[in-house]
């Protein structure tokens, strides 16, 4: 085994560790907000009662130790 192979293994191990960290973070988010898709659907239904909408986008961000839920509602033109 050459010196380059030794470092290559660490590189792939680091990539695997990073992928696992991302997978765990996504799993934690789904556990924190398990009903996010249902909430999006209900928000669309309520807004549709009063106006015509194209789309609703819901994103979750984290700033420091605070979770931010951002809701963007795209309305149809002419209303």
UniProtKB/Swiss-Prot annotation:
The cross-references to Pfam families, in alphabetical order and at most eight, read: MinE (PF03776)
Q: Which InterPro entries match?
A: MinE (IPR005527), MinE_sf (IPR036707)
Q: Which domain of life is it from?
A: Bacteria
What keywords are annotated for this sequence in UniProt? Cell cycle, Cell division
Q: Which GO terms describe its biological process?
A: cell division; regulation of division septum assembly
Q: According to the UniProt entry, where is the signal peptide?
A: none
SS bonds (residue pairs): none
The function of this protein is: Prevents the cell division inhibition by proteins MinC and MinD at internal division sites while permitting inhibition at polar sites. This ensures cell division at the proper site by restricting the formation of a division septum at the midpoint of the long axis of the cell.
Provide the family line: Belongs to the MinE family.
Q: Which HAMAP family match?
A: MinE
Report the protein name in the record. Cell division topological specificity factor
Protein species of origin: Nitratiruptor sp. (strain SB155-2)
Q: What is the lineage of its organism?
A: Bacteria, Pseudomonadati, Campylobacterota, Epsilonproteobacteria, Nautiliales
